[in-house]
Amino acid sequence: YIGIKEIEIGFPSASETDYEICRELIEGGHIPDDVTIQVLVQAREHLIKKTFEAIRGAKHVILHFYNSTSTLQRKVVFHMDTDGITKIATDAADLIYEMAQPLIREGMDLRFEYSPESFMGTEMDYAVEICQAVLEHLHATPENKVILNLPTTVENCMPNQFADMLEYFCKKIPSRDSAIISLHPHNDRGCGVATAEMGLLAGAERVEATLFGNGERTGNVDIVTLAMNMYTQGIDPKLDFSNINK
C-alpha cells in the first residue's frame, strides 16, 4: 500500500481492451472509496462520448483531455493556425462540461484536466492563451479548479528551461487561482526527475508519474525516485515505500 490517491487507469476510448478494463474496475468494485480514477481522451467528439460511457457508475473521476499545440504539429499534422487548434480544445471543453452535468447531479465527483500536448514546443504566450480559453469554457473557479497539465512530451529542452517556461506560464495565465498546475514529465533526455523537481520549484502543485519510470519510449518520471528525493530535503511526499521490495 503506497498511498497514491489519483490513478490514471487508461484510455478507454482508444481500444476495447482499455474500455473493458475501465468497466471491470468500476463494476467489480475494485476501486477504493478514497481513490480517484483518471481517464485519458483526445479532444475528439466520438472519443469523448465513448469515455463518458466508460466512467458511468464511478464515484470519483478526473476526465483528462488533450490536444497538441506545438508549432510543429500545428503545421505538419493539423495544418491549422492557432485559432483552429484553440477551437479543437474549446469545443471539447464545451462538450465535456455539458455531458458532465447530469453525472455531477447524480453525485459523481467529476473533475476536469486539460493538457496542451507538446507544451515544450509551444510558444508560451499561446500556451497561456489556449489554457485560459479552456478554463473559461469549463467554467473554472477558485472553488472548482481545473487541472492544467503541462507535459514535456518528448523532453526537447533542459530542466532549467522547462522551469523558466513554467514560471512564465504561472505568472501570465489570468485565472491562475482557478487552476491546479500539474506536470507530466517524460524522460527522453534522462532528466524526468530533474524536470519535475525544477517544475515544482517554479510553481507546479501536482506531478503525474509512474512507478519506476515505466512509460513509452524511455519512460516517464519515476515517482519513487522523486518522492525519495523529497524525503532527503525534509519534505514528506505522503507516500509509503516501506514495502517497496515487494
Positions of PLM-derived features:
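Catalytic cores and adjacent flexible loops of soluble metabolic enzymes
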Residues: Y1-K246
